[in-house]
């Protein structure tokens, strides 16, 4: 199973979706997006789920559980927390940390985590039962092999009554 934690507004959520969906299509595995709903506690890193205004595949599931990764993906979640802590303590948040993330990617992918905050870092599925994607994935290289499908799914749902889009009912 491919899991991806959503963060940010609609634009960031679209990139997370594109990465996870492309990986799921490539690996022929189901995809579940985790909406941690941490905006409810005032976290600046996440806003409300916004993907429902797009033609998201019905094959992609959503979980709204702040503790899902910690509870069900403990190895991946612990590795993610260590990466964040290391980047904060090493001062990498203040400069380009992509080289560090790229060096760590093979080991993290092997245990079922892909951690990417900036730039393109190739992802490999690895042998872990579950795979957690965390980051922003802001690059077309993450989904170039599935670009036609992804682009079609990221189109807004048209609603003639409102002139442009509205959330799906």
Model segments located where?
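Secretory-pathway luminal glycosyltransferase catalytic domains
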Residues: 45-169
């Amino acid at each position: 199973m491919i899991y991806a934690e959503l963060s940010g507004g609609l634009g960031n959520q679209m990139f997370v979706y594109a990465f996870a969906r492309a990986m799921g299509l490539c690996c022929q595995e189901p995809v579940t997006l985790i909406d941690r709903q941490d905006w409810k506690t005032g976290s600046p890193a996440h806003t409300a789920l916004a993907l429902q205004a797009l033609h998201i595949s019905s094959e992609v599931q959503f979980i709204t559980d702040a503790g899902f990764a910690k509870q069900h993906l403990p190895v991946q979640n612990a590795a993610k927390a260590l990466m964040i802590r290391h980047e904060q303590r090493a001062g990498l948040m203040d400069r380009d940390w992509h080289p560090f993330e790229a060096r760590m990617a093979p080991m993290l992918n092997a245990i079922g985590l892909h951690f990417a905050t900036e730039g393109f870092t190739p992802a490999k599925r690895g042998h872990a039962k579950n795979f957690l994607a965390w980051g922003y994935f802001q690059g077309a290289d993450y989904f170039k092999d599935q670009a036609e499908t992804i682009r079609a799914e990221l189109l807004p749902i048209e609603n003639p009554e409102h002139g442009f889009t509205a959330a799906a009912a």
